[in-house]
Amino acid sequence: MGLWDSLLNWLRSLFFKQEMELSLVGLQNAGKTSLVNAIATGGYSEDMIPTVGFNMRKVTKGNVTIKIWDLGGQRRFRTMWERYCRGVSAIVYVIDAADRDSVPISRSELNDLLTKPSLNGIPLLILGNKIDKSEALSKQALVDQLGLESVTDREVCCYMISCKDSINIDAVIDWLIKHSRTAT
């Protein structure tokens, strides 16, 4: 980014606040709450308590305020996903890339979510988490196994991350900032 772009971004940040609302979904133990903590504080804890229902957290990065709905991934909470995904700036779907047995279930739940008419066109960010583990899938394997090439009704992006080792968390934040909107 050149000096002119930096100056322009600084001027924008003085006059325009950006905001976004996103829903963080995925199966239990995928690392959704760990991702919220990594984005908010850069911190990581091995002793994470499973989310019951949902948690909401606001995080400010630069001039962007991100309202994050962290939704429980247990089967009994998955019916809530659609309700909390309506009208958001983006849907972030987190997958444990090292738990290969859970990928078919993740694919099924993701496909079910994407068929909801109320969610048409909302950008989708897929995050393959836990790439610090040797058994983690590659990005291409995850894209293939989730069938992401067939999703054509919305923007789809996929990053492989590690909340534990802070791998690609900055890229996720950059993607989120680019998908925020000016507050009116």
From Swiss-Prot:
Q: Is the keyword Mitochondrion in the record? A: no
InterPro entries according to UniProt: Arl8a/8b (IPR044154), P-loop_NTPase (IPR027417), Small_GTP-bd (IPR005225), Small_GTPase_ARF/SAR (IPR006689)
Query: What happens in the null mutant?
Result: In the triple mutants arl8a-1 arl8b-1 arl8c-1, impaired multiplication of tomato mosaic virus (ToMV).
Residue span of the signal peptide, if any? Answer: none
What keywords tag this UniProt record? Cell cycle, Cell division, Chromosome partition, Cytoplasm, Cytoskeleton, Endosome, GTP-binding, Lysosome, Membrane, Mitosis, Nucleotide-binding
Q: List the Gene3D superfamilies.
A: P-loop containing nucleotide triphosphate hydrolases
Q: Where in the cell is it found?
A: Late endosome membrane; Lysosome membrane; Cytoplasm, Cytoskeleton, Spindle
Describe the intramembrane regions by residue range. 1-18
| Family per similarity comment | Belongs to the small GTPase superfamily. Arf family.
- This chain's protein is named ADP-ribosylation factor-like protein 8c
The record's gene field reads ARL8C
